[in-house]
A protein has these predicted regions:
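Domain-level signature for soluble enzymes in the chorismate/prephenate branch of the shikimate pathway
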Residues: 1-173
Length: 173
């Protein structure tokens, strides 16, 4: 088991659902900022929100006899988000890379993907839905709650965290 680590907040939540029970996110660092978002092709002009997506998902299923496909590298976070917004008529397609290409290679209709600037989405004629922000992410320092219960480990972890904090304050990454 790990005592201390650095990971992207998105990867932490995707890989380890319920991890908050065992790990404390000590702080977010000032680098690696990105957002996990829902994006649709630009030519889907009638789809601006998740509610619009829900509406067309029923039409899509009736017309094509299959559910709307959502390509993603984040199936857990995507499912949790879409279901919380009431979207039910979709199927997750696990992306192995270049997720933004999936709608244009007929592997999915829409995507969820991580983006820092949105430039790659725009370059691939995709746009983020108005309410399509799933998760804000950045690199963060993680601490095992179990390790914090050990006096010696807690002392060492605090020293390390103070050094990291001082270094981050004096010089950007």
């Amino acid at each position: 088991s790990l005592d201390l680590g650095i990971s992207g907040y998105d990867l932490l939540n995707e890989s380890l659902p319920g991890v908050q029970n065992n790990i404390k996110v000590n702080s977010r660092l000032n680098f690696g900022a990105a957002e996990l978002v829902v994006a649709v092709p630009n030519d889907w002009i009638d789809v601006q929100t998740i509610a619009d997506l829900e509406e067309i998902s029923f039409e899509f299923k009736d017309k094509n006899t299959v559910k709307l496909r959502v390509a993603t590298k984040y199936p857990n976070l995507t499912n949790e988000f879409l279901l919380s917004k009431g979207l039910t008529q979709y199927k997750i397609v696990n992306s192995l890379g270049s997720t933004e290409m999936y709608p244009f290679t007929d592997q999915s209709e829409i995507i969820t993907d991580i983006t820092s600037t949105g430039a790659t989405l725009k370059d691939n004629k995709l746009r983020i839905l108005k309410d399509g922000d799933i998760l804000k992410s950045s690199a963060c320092i993680l601490v095992s709650k179990k390790s914090l219960r050990d006096k010696y480990k807690k002392k060492v972890i605090k020293k390390l965290l103070n050094k990291i904090k001082k270094r981050a304050e004096n010089q950007p990454f």
